[in-house]
């Protein structure tokens, strides 16, 4: 039994080390270069007659991602809005894919008095996405799909699902004067508004903010709105 567990562990390490090309029908292991990875994936896919490749997104550390930050800590330095996705555009950047999500604000529940990191530079969108209209903002997110040499390359962040159209979101934002924004703690500050105005996280975690939303507000938009009005 011990030898079997050792063998399974060794296999798992090997898979992580070599990288993965994932297609609709097979998973093939290859040595992935550190530079020009997206072009390499496209070339390998074409050589194998594939038209689509799926790869994992890199790990990202987000401002506000510390699990001990409470909901009230986040409210003290964030803008809280209800918004919906208007458009999205994916771009290849530094051997990874970034998707710029354009949101329209439906309601502002709370405006931040100051940014948690005044010296942090705001996200810089591609010129093609400018100008940003009043009442809209742009959020960059790792992952998305781009086409390189006729091959669709999809990068997936399993801990931070893609934003969806026809879905209302409650967002905890670091909103900059430029009209760009980041969500507090990445996926931690993103909630879907579902039936009966319930607010549910896009990705379940043990983060204190999500626990507070459940225990203090009962995942209720109405209860949250009342709490924010008296701040």
Go through the PLM ranges and name each one.
Residues 2-231:
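Transition segments tied to proteolytic processing and entry into folded domains
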